[in-house]
């Protein structure tokens, strides 16, 4: 038994490392000349371009039937409970299990980092994060904590019924979180996801507004696991590759393979961060725009898709104190929101493309899901003028 545990532990290290090495060889969408929108990106073109935001991953894979993980997004380097950031949640389609949603909507703030994982591990991940938070200095008297945990269902590539996420996986994601470049593709909560019938995963992007619009940064991170009719910068990639939703029903060619009809169930978690001083009300408005970016990629928010957006602001002037009494906060006016809306749409769209471009093919749980074929995709993008 001890030998088996040691082998599984070794595989859990070697397999994610091998997948990460393959992913590093694949380009991001901007690397091949696809420029989404008009706003410039931040230094890393990642959610971590918003100062203070950190991301950590734990990938859990045994090479046989387990293919899942945890992704942690920390809003700032301090204690998320003691120094709360304003936040909002928008639900595009509510077929999902986002834990902690009602209190965020009621109070408009985060009390914990944000975790993403697989559907049946939401509660295990939340429990582990609560234990981790309660052990932090200054938390000795805390008796209520609103853990915010999102999910998508990776039950095709992952034996989800085994609920493989353990406390040490969650702690590792939280404690390994860093700023700088963010690993994308088959990693963390994106290890077992599928998007548009190809391997999905984690993707991220950012936008920086010009000084005339405030100079603020918006960053987005997604966990893509949904269906639809893939478009990239307007090019009908899914249709051209013959793999898209409703292909069997409305296909133009009698030779279409029924297996190419992309299943409509699935979900996406979208996390939006900004350093603009926004109230939770305007953060909710910002979150709605992420769904517009999602729709640009070919999603139609199917019946079985859980499409959720969590948005928060890291600006010092909007931090919420745990002490009583009146407080004064900065609040960007409604009239200054439009540039942030555009930035959110663009960064969400590009994040989804990056999740597909960086993902590699995976075989697990008796199933193989191929990565988006890059050469064929690039040829389609050139033909439709999507590459600049």
How does the language model describe each region?
Residues 7-17:
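Bacterial N-terminal signal peptides
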Residues 22-388:
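Alpha/propeptide regions of enzymes that mature by internal proteolysis
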Residues 1-4:
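Positively charged n-region of N-terminal signal peptides that target proteins for export
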């Amino acid at each position: 038994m001890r030998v088996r545990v040691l082998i599984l532990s070794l595989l859990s290290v070697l397999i994610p490392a091998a997948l990460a090495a393959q992913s590093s060889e694949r380009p991001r969408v901007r690397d091949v000349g696809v420029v989404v929108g008009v706003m410039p990106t931040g230094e890393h073109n990642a959610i971590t371009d918003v100062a203070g935001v950190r991301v950590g991953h734990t990938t859990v894979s045994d090479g046989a039937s387990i293919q899942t993980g945890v992704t942690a997004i920390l809003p700032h380097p301090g204690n998320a409970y003691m120094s709360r950031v304003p936040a909002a949640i928008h639900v595009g389609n509510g077929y999902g299990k986002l834990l902690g949603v009602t209190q965020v909507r009621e109070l408009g703030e985060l009390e914990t980092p944000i975790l993403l994982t697989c559907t049946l591990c939401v509660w295990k991940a939340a429990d582990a994060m609560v234990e981790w938070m309660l052990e932090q200095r200054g938390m000795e008297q805390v008796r209520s904590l609103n853990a915010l945990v999102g999910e998508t269902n990776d039950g095709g590539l992952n034996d989800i019924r085994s609920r493989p996420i353990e406390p040490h996986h969650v702690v590792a994601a939280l404690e390994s979180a860093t700023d700088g470049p963010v690993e994308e593709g088959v990693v963390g909560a994106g290890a077992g996801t599928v998007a548009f019938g190809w391997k999905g995963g984690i993707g991220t992007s950012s936008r920086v507004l010009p000084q005339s619009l405030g100079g603020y940064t918006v960053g987005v991170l997604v966990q893509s696991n949904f269906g639809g009719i893939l478009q990239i910068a307007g090019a009908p990639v899914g249709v051209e590759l013959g793999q898209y939703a409703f292909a069997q029903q409305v296909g133009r060619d009698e030779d279409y393979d029924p297996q190419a009809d992309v299943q409509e169930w699935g979900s996406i978690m979208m996390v939006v961060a900004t350093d603009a001083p926004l109230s939770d009300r305007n953060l909710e408005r910002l979150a709605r725009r992420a769904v517009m970016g999602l729709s640009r990629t070919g999603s139609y928010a199917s019946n079985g898709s859980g499409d959720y957006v969590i948005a928060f602001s890291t600006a010092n002037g909007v931090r919420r104190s745990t002490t009583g009494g009146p407080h004064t906060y900065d609040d960007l006016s409604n009239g200054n929101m439009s540039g942030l809306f555009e930035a959110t749409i663009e960064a969400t769209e590009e994040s989804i493309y990056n999740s597909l471009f960086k993902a590699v093919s995976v075989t697990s749980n008796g199933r193989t899901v191929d990565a988006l074929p890059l050469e064929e995709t690039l040829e389609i993008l050139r033909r439709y003028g999507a590459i600049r």
